């Protein structure tokens, strides 16, 4: 059966903004309040979330701005033209492996959490296998359709976040948020560095910019920055709710505080006692989007390096490898460490490569007068 494909395979700035926001909201948001609470005192974590988010918004704006300098050129093409082909292929190969590994990481994490909260009797291997199958089905077809799917799913997730806070309002204690500004300045610096990884996902704009239509391409950098800030506000809301309901000391001891918030909700005197199951089921949607985006970017880069290889061939060869890789970590701590390493590699490549491209591009423009990229 031939997969359906859009005739234009183009997207606008709105779609790329939704894609960025959907990619950022993932597994990390479930443990984010604990990670931030371990870096700060009381409710001070909102400050490092805001600062880290602003930095990522600027980085997202920057990488997208660089990408749109080369309309209808993919990442491999313009990095090859400005950084030489060997350098471009080396960076792209590292990114393909990183995004494929992130796909494995997300698949394993969602399987572990699903087993903990929903499917206690189902083996992790089966959960991971079926989740990966659904991801493969999603990315095997139209790339534009996959990106437009974020426009449908993201509002549902954002509504779930707002409901999570509103339905816990009767359990909130303002005193749990006080006193304010008790964290040392040096600890803020460490916290901001760690909080930046919370908003990783903006880099997908660097690779999907090739699909932007000419009418809205110039709006894309600001759309990406706004998308990151939507996540910042959502995360601050989740964090403040966790601290006000649990206290910051209790939040530090919870593995997934965001899900635990759902467990505290009761509607109508026991009418709805498992809101956490509904919330987590909704959250699987955005984790699916995150995983699909990373896997699709890996296929996009690989096929850009080797144009004769079709996307479907890459997927069906790499999928079994990804499944085997996601079974390697023996514990949750090991898995989390892998996630941190991948985040460092991801962040380093997607910031350094566009920066070098921009420097070389400016030098060429200066030497070549009013030369513009083809």
Swiss-Prot record:
Localization: Membrane
Alphabetically ordered keywords of this record: Germination, Membrane, Transmembrane, Transmembrane helix, Transport
Transmembrane spans: 16-36, 44-64, 86-106, 122-142, 149-169, 192-212, 227-247, 279-301, 313-333, 341-361
Major localisation: membrane
Superkingdom of origin: Bacteria
Keyword Phosphoprotein appears in the UniProt entry: no
Any one of the GO BP annotations: spore germination
Bilayer topology annotation: Multi-pass membrane protein
Coiled-coil annotated residue ranges, if any: none
Cellular component, GO annotation: membrane
InterPro entries: Spore_GerAB
The keyword Methyltransferase is assigned to this record: no
Similarity comment: family membership: Belongs to the amino acid-polyamine-organocation (APC) superfamily. Spore germination protein (SGP) (TC 2.A.3.9) family.
Role this protein plays: Contributes to the L-alanine germination response.
PANTHER family: SPORE GERMINATION PROTEIN A2
Name the UniProt record assigns to this protein: Spore germination protein GerLB
Organism listed in the record: Bacillus cereus
Gene that produces this protein: gerLB
